[in-house]
């Protein structure tokens, strides 16, 4: 059975690291179809030639696979001449097994697009795509920082120092001052004098925790290098944070940035990194369910013979999924309805599944907040009573700043 075409002029692009193969399918006024095939290199002059050829063809649709990062530069070249290409999931365009060539792949893409069988993936605006470089590298630096802090803790334990037992945060102001003093070779009484009076542990316990079997020269050297690396990473992350926030404000994302912070579990940087990934315009997704599917937070759909089976979450945007899990962890410890939801889920599903389920719920709520341009509302919270409290949650303080 022949499939009736929807588009009359379509270009399919098979993109590789060093080569781009294009196939244009053009329907003539008499109903006949012609095929035009071209090959381009990977350099800027080649991408410019590709854009000029596409303009000459005048396509209704230009489609390409999301092949790693190779699609980005051809996409930008086409975008510069006013052509918004479709970037499609490679799993949705798998050809029938047989003879496989670059030309055949490009023609297959064009044929599917011509019949209206493809759906374009969400591609963020150019300004957000640019800011993703900052946000994602910032997340990578955060992972390196956490790893270095763990190494420091492990090395102190190796030397017999149990400071992590008596302080809640080994990298807090007081604990870091004591660690630096130990590295510098200060005596235990001198180190103990740096302990803050606000620490819950007694001076006797802190004194015992600072006792080491032996801090060797190798211990001191590695501890000194790790501490220097930690401080360098913290300084670098602060620069990334400042640049990301400045760029978002200049791009006009100040309002959604403020709205996101009214939800429990989301701080300023979390809101900024989420906004860079999903944007502020929810109409591009169409519904909260589609957004959750794109992120990969929705439950798997696995049904056979009328029986629904438990399914794993699908693959999606790993950067957003990681952020949502962090938000859910924080919201599960806040004074809000999300905490009650997490505790109810935790009894039935366990901690890890409950975090994913709560992250899914938060994402759907975020969609509604950004779509309606409104702040988060928790029906179980007495906002007037909490706003006058000295220890009001941060997300309530953010809401009060709006008014």
Predicted segments with their positions:
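A detector of single, family-specific signature residues
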Residues: 1-401
């Amino acid at each position: 059975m022949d499939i009736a075409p929807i588009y009359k002029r379509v270009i399919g692009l098979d993109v590789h690291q060093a080569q781009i193969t294009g196939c244009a399918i053009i329907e003539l006024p008499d109903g006949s179809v012609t095929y035009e095939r071209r090959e381009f290199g990977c350099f800027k002059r080649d991408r410019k030639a590709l854009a000029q050829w596409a303009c000459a063809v005048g396509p209704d649709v230009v489609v390409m696979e999301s092949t790693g990062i190779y699609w980005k530069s051809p996409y930008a070249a086409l975008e510069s001449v006013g052509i918004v290409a479709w970037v499609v999931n490679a799993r949705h365009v798998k050809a029938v097994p047989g003879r496989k060539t670059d030309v055949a792949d490009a023609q297959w893409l064009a044929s599917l697009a011509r019949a209206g069988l493809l759906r374009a993936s969400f591609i963020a605006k150019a300004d957000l795509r640019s800011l993703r470089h900052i946000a994602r590298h910032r997340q990578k630096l955060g992972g390196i920082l956490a790893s270095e802090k763990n190494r420091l803790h492990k090395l102190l334990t190796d030397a017999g120092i149990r400071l992590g037992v008596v302080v809640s945060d080994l990298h807090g102001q007081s604990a870091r001052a004591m660690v630096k003093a130990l590295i510098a070779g200060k005596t235990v009484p001198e180190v103990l004098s740096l302990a803050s009076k606000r620490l819950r542990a007694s001076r006797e316990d802190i004194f015992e925790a600072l006792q080491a079997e032996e801090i060797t020269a190798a211990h001191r050297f590695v501890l000194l290098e790790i501490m220097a690396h930690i401080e360098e990473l913290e300084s670098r992350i602060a620069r990334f944070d400042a640049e990301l926030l400045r760029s978002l404000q200049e791009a006009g994302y100040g309002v959604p940035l403020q709205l996101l912070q009214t939800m429990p579990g989301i701080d300023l940087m979390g809101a900024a990194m989420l906004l860079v990934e999903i944007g502020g315009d929810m109409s591009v997704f169409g519904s909260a369910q589609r957004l959750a599917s794109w992120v990969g937070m929705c439950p798997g759909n696995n049904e056979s013979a009328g029986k629904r089976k438990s399914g794993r979450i699908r693959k999606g945007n790993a950067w957003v999924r990681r952020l949502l899990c962090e938000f859910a962890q924080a919201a599960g410890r806040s004074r809000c309805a999300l905490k009650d939801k997490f505790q109810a889920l935790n009894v039935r599903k366990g901690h890890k599944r409950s975090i994913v389920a709560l992250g899914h719920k938060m994402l759907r709520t975020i969609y509604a907040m950004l779509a309606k341009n409104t702040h988060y509302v928790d029906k179980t919270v007495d906002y007037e009573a909490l706003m006058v409290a000295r220890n009001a949650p941060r997300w309530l303080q953010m809401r009060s700043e709006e008014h």
